[in-house]
């Protein structure tokens, strides 16, 4: 990159415009995208900020980076591969990968149809971790209100309490086991697969491997594991784990909800892909969310982002978004290896409303720091309790309004003085009740929670994260921090398995103490 970001002209102009922009929500700003409505009214706004954003996008070569994403260029430059998840959900994938994508897509759907017809399995045990787990787990939980075709349980943690809990809810003779791992060397799914195989064997299943399918980019490793070729579903090394939901990793979604649901999920995401590609800057929802997030994180100093879906069915959206945002944007180096020089990805956290209001909203309203909030709500519910849904919407809108508007010391003092004759006490009480306001938020409104709208919502966040990666000049498609931790864990496992080995010089003092102590348990 030609300019060091913090001292580049476009960044300096963007920073100044963000600091001076209005944060009072005076100008209504709602963007329609793939059936969703995204309200950015409560974000920093001004004409000068819009103009500075356009200059920053030009400086960071955004149009070229976006074209590279869609065209299969080397978007993941540190690993020298594309990040072509948009191709996975396209009706007509790019010619270079169309045959492979369409063939594997049809293999997944044919397999689901065959199982539906044979009634061979009414239980599914899904073993994955990270992107191969959170995506299918989140979608299946979000859409199960329409009914599940199979009893599906997910186990990801290498803590065997998790897989024990999952298999305790399944009939081994009627269970299909899915082992989902890009490399097919990942510790957690393979360790849990061993538990599952023993469980099937102990239940009297004559040939447990016939109950197992694999979803992987390493087909040879799955075959070496003993899985039949017709039960190995493939994706490619250019599919990042946190974007793999759109590939054959979506198999458990189709098994649980049907092929039609998976198709609609992809269609919603594809519609958002087209919006992100074609919509102009001021009407581009992912891009405007990215710019608002950039201003909040790198200029205004907000270190975190709260996501509060006012729909309990989206209970797994937050951990899915945590992985997407924090694994993608928790980076320190720009494209040429120099430090980025500004704060990058925020800590993402949250939970569904209205539970969140009784957990952490006090902090959002009155803490000295605060955080931007993404509020998510559906226009229409899938239950018959209309007034309950009105209550849910009212709480969502009220919390957002309170964070934006705040309440001044003078207004609160006037209210307290109506029933408190002691002026000194009234003044003290008033200071405890001040709400600073001016706290940024987005409101994302879905027509209802169906597969199409959910696909659009997930792609909205994916493209927001990609755009922020471009603006910061970082690679949102690698995860070297994760890989380093895995490497160290493998070394420690060897020492725990063979505590007599003399490796005293390989660890820091605390880690050495605990290896020695816990290996004697």
UniProtKB/Swiss-Prot annotation:
It holds the Pfam family PGI. The keyword Isomerase applies. Keywords: Cytoplasm, Gluconeogenesis, Glycolysis, Isomerase. Coiled coil: none annotated. It is found in: Cytoplasm. It comes from Bordetella petrii (strain ATCC BAA-461 / DSM 12804 / CCUG 43448). Its EC number is 5.3.1.9. GO terms for biological process: gluconeogenesis; glucose 6-phosphate metabolic process; glycolytic process. Pathway: Carbohydrate biosynthesis; gluconeogenesis; Carbohydrate degradation; glycolysis; D-glyceraldehyde 3-phosphate and glycerone phosphate from D-glucose: step 2/4. The keyword Transmembrane helix does not apply. It catalyses: alpha-D-glucose 6-phosphate = beta-D-fructose 6-phosphate. It comes from the Bacteria. The active site is at 327 (proton donor), 358, 486. Belongs to the GPI family. This is Glucose-6-phosphate isomerase. Catalyzes the reversible isomerization of glucose-6-phosphate to fructose-6-phosphate.
